[in-house]
Amino acid sequence: MPPRLVADKHEIKRIRTYINGLDENVQGVIPEGHITLISGAAGTMKSSITFNVLYHEAVNGSNGLYISLEQSAESLLNHMTNMDYDFSKINLVVVKDLAELSAKMQVINRSKGSIFIVDVGCVRKEIRDIQTDNNKSWLNVIKNVIKKVSVESNTRVFVLDSLSALYVLSRFENPRIELFMIFEFLRDMNITSFLISEMPLDGSKFSEYEIEDFLADAIIVLKLTPFRRQVVREISVVKMRTTACNNDIFSLEFKNGQFYALYGGQNPLL
């Protein structure tokens, strides 16, 4: 479904990142239905900030989908538990067998928001009838999961962890065409999407093929920056369509269960 034409900018609905200090600097943040690249090297908290969006949306009554292609659901959730997320406030549905997806969606408490975590790594171990040399099979599996969960549970937000793993799994023969079709599929689903992208340490590019940079509606970059013999996590919004945004670099901190973007455009106070 293509985005409708709005008569006034206040008609544009937005999804927060729930990062204090960042949302206020990007016009309330991401327009609904947009696709955002979350780019960063290892250890920059890409998975954490995307899960943070899903969690707070679920606390507010919305549903979200997290598809992990490599990291196990247990590893992800143990990490989030250590960050003090309270899962009693939401429905947390872990799917390791796609045959159980419909049944698990039917028994959730409708008075709460939900996070559906599909552990594709586990599914890959169990499924034997998908040809691993067919670059379309796993991509179609992932699309079908997104479509099913989105339609049947009215999912508002989707996270793919990660694009890099998808490229290994699906081996794109013509990245420009195939990536265009993936991005258009997500837009047709009218779901706000966060696509995690592995970035080299030198920050020389935001994505594997660099085509993603142009197809995405927004790019949020996370970095680890040495500063006075300490390492500072940093966050910046490189681009965001339909949004007046501050492109300054902020320090990214997590404390007392909340993310904070601090010292935008300034040296961090260390």
Predicted features along the sequence, with ranges:
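Extreme N-terminal, non-catalytic leader segments
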Residues: 1-33, 39
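C-terminal regions of RecA-like/P-loop NTPase motor modules
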Residues: 2-9, 240-270
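Walker A/P-loop NTP-binding active-site region of P-loop NTPases
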Residues: 25-97
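Hydrophobic/aromatic beta-strand patches that form the interior of the parallel beta-sheet core
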Residues: 36, 65-67, 116-118, 194, ...
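Short, ordered loop/turn segments at secondary-structure junctions
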Residues: 41-43, 69-72, 92-97, 122, ...
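Conserved inter-motif catalytic segment of the P-loop NTP-binding fold
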Residues: 67-156
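P-loop NTPase motor core
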Residues: 130-214
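Phosphate-binding/switch region of NTP-binding enzymes
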Residues: 191-257
